[in-house]
Swiss-Prot record:
pH dependence: Optimum pH is 8.2-8.5.
Summary of the function given for this chain in its UniProt record: Catalyzes the transfer of acetyl from acetyl-CoA to desacetylmycothiol (Cys-GlcN-Ins) to form mycothiol.
Residue numbers binding acetyl-CoA 1: 80-82, 88-93
Keywords from the named record: Acyltransferase, Repeat, Transferase
Organism expressing this protein natively: Mycobacterium tuberculosis (strain ATCC 25618 / H37Rv)
Domain N-acetyltransferase positions: 4-141, 152-315
Gene: mshD
Source organism superkingdom: Bacteria
Record protein name field: Mycothiol acetyltransferase
Chemical reaction(s) catalysed: 1D-myo-inositol 2-(L-cysteinylamino)-2-deoxy-alpha-D-glucopyranoside + acetyl-CoA = mycothiol + CoA + H(+)
HAMAP family reported in the protein's UniProt record: MshD
Record-level Gene Ontology MF annotations: mycothiol synthase activity; protein-N-terminal-alanine acetyltransferase activity
């Protein structure tokens, strides 16, 4: 097998090769092997990159692993992909072992879709599932009409003047969350720069009563229309200020966002005429209350992503 090559940065050609690898693998597996944050990191120097090149000099990359640094009390996070035509050669196992060696065993691995090759690799390395992220979907029809309670005003994102309140609520709602917590203006700016960003898709709920501080954000629903998947929208981030919980804001914001997605996707056709437009979301499997709320809104389980770690480690 070709040698493993750790990098702190990737050239433009290497970035393109990794993106092509991800695209080819997604087409075969039906699920992206890495999350969008990994693609966002290809041009940065905030994570480490492990490359496996093909046997032909100057040929395409056939294996890639991204290793992000630890956040908070948790360990590092790795995501990897092997070209479908290069599987069963030990490349994935070798990359995973290299990541474990670099972190002294203190890292997790995301397995998107929890596919058979990922389960087999995890078993061979003595890894066990430590976290599950459920993808749920529902069709964009028969949407419950949202009811906006008294004392709440809804509007969409007006620009960077909203950022301070947006960050305050996000970081309070996701305190301790490994991916969504601890955001700064950098994370917001990166997402505003994405091709899919639409200010009308970022829905904000403000308090409007004598007891509320003027301009206080109660919650938000950041929706996303997938440019590469016609007819598919996403509940990208839904956050409610912990101090404003138990007021039905989460369900209200979810419904408003779904209505917004249905309006924006109404004229778009899916790649498969037999598949109707839909909205997806991700939720932690142990967040039972959220799962039940989404089920009550018509969402059902579509797939499950699993985070694996060495058995017996505190990851």
């Amino acid at each position: 097998m070709t040698a493993l090559d750790w990098r702190s940065a990737l050239t433009a050609d290497e970035q393109r090769s990794v993106r092509a690898l991800v695209t080819a693998t997604t087409a075969v597996d039906g699920v992206a092997p890495v999350g969008e944050q990994v693609l966002r990191e290809l041009g940065q120097q905030r994570t480490e990159h492990l490359l496996v090149a093909g046997s032909r000099p100057g040929g395409p990359i056939i294996g890639y692993l991204n290793l992000s640094p630890p956040r908070g009390a948790g360990g590092a996070m790795a995501e990897l992909v092997v070209h479908p035509q290069s599987r069963r050669r030990g490349i994935g196992t070798a990359m995973a072992r290299a990541a474990l060696a670099k972190t002294a065993g203190r890292n997790q691995f995301w397995a998107h879709g929890t596919l058979d090759p990922a389960r087999a690799t995890a078993s061979a390395l003595g890894l066990v599932g430590v976290r599950e992220l459920i993808q749920m979907r529902r069709p964009l029809r028969d949407i419950p009409e949202p009811t906006i309670p008294d004392g709440v005003v809804i509007r969409t994102y007006a620009g960077t003047s909203d950022d301070a309140e947006l960050l305050r609520v996000n970081n309070a709602a996701f305190a301790g969350h490994p991916e969504q917590g601890g955001w700064t203006a950098v994370q917001l700016a990166e997402r505003r720069g994405e091709a899919w960003f639409d200010p009308d898709g970022l829905i904000l709920a403000f308090g409007d009563s004598p007891r509320e501080r003027p301009g206080r954000l109660l919650g938000f629903h950041w929706t996303k229309v997938h440019p590469d998947h016609p007819g598919l929208g996403e509940v990208y981030v839904l956050g409610v200020d912990p101090a404003a919980q138990r007021r039905g804001l989460g369900q209200m914001l979810t419904s408003i966002g779904i209505v917004s997605l249905a309006r924006r996707l109404g004229g778009r056709k899916t790649l498969d005429p037999a598949v109707e437009p839909a909205v997806l979301l991700y939720v932690e499997s142990d967040n039972v209350a959220a799962v039940r709320t989404y089920q009550s809104l018509g969402f059902t389980t579509y797939s499950v992503d699993t985070a694996y770690a060495l058995a017996g480690t505190d990851n």
